[in-house]
Every structure is written in C-alpha cells, then in structure tokens.
C-alpha cells in the first residue's frame, strides 16, 4: 500500500485522542528510531512514567517465581481483603518492549475496578526469549501461584488472563495452552483482550492504517514477529496464529476490545466473529476514535478508563454467573 493511499488517521481520531497525541513531555528526548532495542526499552519506560502517575494506592508485593528458564518477576496487587478471583496481566510492547512499570497504572485500575487480585507477569522479552518461552513462563507462574495460593493469600479457584496488544495474544494463547495440555491452575473464568494481534498476516485495517504515530507499519509488525518467533514454521503454530487453534470448544469467555484506527482491528473482529459463530461466550466492543495503545492514557482520556471498566465488568459478571 502506497503511504498516500492510507487513511489520514491523525485527522480522523477523536478530540481526546488528539489531545494525547499532542501532549509533549518537555524533558523527554526524541524516540531513538535508529537505536538498539535496549535504548528503545529505556526510552519506552521513561516515556510511560508520565502516564502511570496517579494510580490507585493498594497493597502491592513483588515476587520472583521459578520457571525452567529461570526466575521471572511478578507484581501482585491486592485491592481488598476479600479476593473473589485472580487475574494475570500480560503487558504489551510488541514482545520486545514493556515491563511491570510501564503498565502499572493499567494493572492497578483493573484491580480496583474488578476488586480481584491482579498479578502482573514480567515475561522475558524478545529477541532474548523466542516463542514459546513467554507463554511457558506465564503458564509456569500460574502453576506456581496455584500451588502456593495460601502462602500468597490469593484465590486461585477462579482465574483470568488479561493483556493489551502483544499481551492480549499471550493472554489468550496461555489460556488455550492450559486447555490443550489439560493443566489445572483453577477455572479460567474470563480472558480480557485489548487490541490484540491473533495471527492475521494481512487485512484491510493493516493496509489502511498504521504509521509512525503507533509503530505499527507493515515493516514494524514484521520486525516484532521476527524478533519473537524462533523460525518460519512458528507463524502457523496454534499458539501464535490463534486462528489455527480450535476455537469451537471450551474457549473461556472473552472480552474483545478494538480501537477504531488500529491496524490490528481486523484481528479482533475476526476473533469475535469466529467465537460467536461457534457459540463461544464473547463480547466485542469498538472504541471509536481511538488509536492502538489507548489503554495507557486513562490519566487524560475517559475512553481509556471506560475500556478498563468494561473489561473489569465483563470479568465480574462472569464470576457472578459461576
């Protein structure tokens, strides 16, 4: 697609999204476009500090949990003494960026709105870790907390997975991994997915959308994929191209959130249509005027806060139905 044939996205986004795009952090250096991944990670963490200010205070604990790849950092958020369930959160960042600090506010708000314990898992980033290491680390962390639930004062009888962008793929992939390999870590009551990628190689939205404003050009997406996967065959794995998995049975209830001007929107639409066609419990919600990654901006945008509340409500409703 020639760039001039793409939609003029920055002219079409909502007023509140434009406010975020135009927000300048005066002490922030330019994005290191030609820098190393380490430099980009450092910048991303610095840039996200502004957006994590003002999150709800609650009891928080940090722990390292064992996996076959070594110890993985986790952060547990306890919003209240009563804990109806535990949500595992997987951060986005194209598999190569992000950590527990860059998504701290998101996790705190999700814990506050759901009133469930939230555990963030700091899975090893790519390219240091190649598929399926991140999924195996997530599953190992779930198993560990299931076995040690009493020690950590958490309820692991009912669990959920949640994530944004690449983290959304990891969330659903982990839930399917548990199902397929018959691993008991508690009943998966729901999966919360914000603007994820689920395996499409091409789509209408990937052609019409994506640019320097969201880091999701076709070249960007190819770079993330090459960093994450071990080899070409992994592209068809049912835990990377989730449409190659069996989505006709025993898929946990899914809340699927899409952003109107996200190149990955068609991934979310296809996931919803597939699940709905096979009577798998799911809900799709489109957030008008939004760019990819809008969930970060709840400090300034009501729509971002609404999207977190919507996911929390979906999960709470599923708990009530059990």
Swiss-Prot record:
Pfam families, per the entry: Abhydrolase_3
What role does this protein play? Displays esterase activity towards short chain fatty esters (acyl chain length of up to 8 carbons). Able to hydrolyze triacetylglycerol (triacetin) and tributyrylglycerol (tributyrin), but not trioleylglycerol (triolein) or cholesterol oleate. Negatively regulates MalT activity by antagonizing maltotriose binding. Inhibits MelA galactosidase activity.
Output the InterPro entries linked to this UniProt entry.
Answer: AB_hydrolase_3, AB_hydrolase_fold, Acetyl_esterase, GDXG_lipolytic_enzyme, Lipase_GDXG_HIS_AS, Lipase_GDXG_put_SER_AS
Where is this chain's protein located in or outside the cell?
Cytoplasm
GO MF, any single term: carboxylic ester hydrolase activity
Active-site annotation: 165, 262, 292
Tell me where on the tree of life, at the top rank, the source sits: Bacteria
Q: What does the UniProt keyword field contain?
A: Cytoplasm, Hydrolase, Serine esterase
One GO cellular component assignment for this chain's record is: cytoplasm
Q: Quote the EC number.
A: 3.1.1.-
What does the annotation say about its assembly with partners? Homodimer. Interacts with MalT and MelA.
Source gene? aes
Name of the protein in its database record:
Acetyl esterase
User: Which cysteine pairs are covalently linked by disulfides here?
Assistant: none
Task: Motif Involved in the stabilization of the negatively charged intermediate by the formation of the oxyanion hole — list its residue ranges.
Answer: 91-93
Q: Which family does it belong to?
A: Belongs to the 'GDXG' lipolytic enzyme family.
> Principal place where this protein is found?
cytoplasm
KW Cell division (keyword) present: no
